[in-house]
Curated annotation (Swiss-Prot):
Keywords: Fatty acid biosynthesis, Fatty acid metabolism, Lipid biosynthesis, Lipid metabolism, NADP, Oxidoreductase. Transmembrane segments: none annotated. The keyword Lipid metabolism applies. The keyword RNA-binding does not apply. SUPFAM superfamilies: NAD(P)-binding Rossmann-fold domains (SSF51735). Pathway: Lipid metabolism; fatty acid biosynthesis. GO terms for biological process: fatty acid biosynthetic process. It comes from Aggregatibacter actinomycetemcomitans. Catalyzes the NADPH-dependent reduction of beta-ketoacyl-ACP substrates to beta-hydroxyacyl-ACP products, the first reductive step in the elongation cycle of fatty acid biosynthesis. It comes from the Bacteria. This is 3-oxoacyl-[acyl-carrier-protein] reductase FabG.
Amino acid sequence: MSETILITGSSRGIGKAIALRLAQAGFDIVVHCRSRIEEAEAVAQAVRELGQNARVLQFDVSCRSEAADKLTADVEAHGAYYGVVLNAGLTRDNAFPALTDEDWDRVLRTNLDGFYNVLHPIMMPMIRRRKAGRIVCITSVSGLIGNRGQVNYSASKAGIIGAAKALAVELAKRKITVNCVAPGLIDTDILDENVPIDEILKMIPAGRMGDPEEVAHAVNFLMGEKAAYVTRQVIAVNGGLC
């Protein structure tokens, strides 16, 4: 029987690429979305066409009660997850003086609170498996070096890195690894039109944007058996930006 991995925010973009790559590696996939249910179902079907099982969960990671209810019910019905990829997130970019309370709160609730809201309900079931497990958090270069116009986003992603490193210490003896993958500028259809791509490209030694599949390959490595001794780390996929 294949192990199962939950991937939040996997209806498109990087999350979709991760779902398909992990399915190719032989994992069953729980596709997650907040609102794009048709796109999520399409990803699930693509996973099935790769020979793996897939199902879809729909909930808002920023809503603690909703996340707990949906995840608890899914684990009770299907069993604990082997792995989790925390990919769901959003941006509300603006210069710091121009940020609104909602800009700040929405980003922190989704990106940082989402870490707790998703992992807390499923943590004890993962531990009770008494088997190896994997947690990968998709963070950002912004969480490593900060980025102009992204004080809220940078704070949320840096917070995830800190939380992941602390959780890695707690779970290491239980053979559950916790790591982060920090993408830089990645070419997806959800790239914010306000992102100064030409300006950023000048700062990237590789001279190009990354592909979602390149992020997915890093996640695939961390999910594998050969990464059992890799924990509490941040793998940057950013073309040398930092």
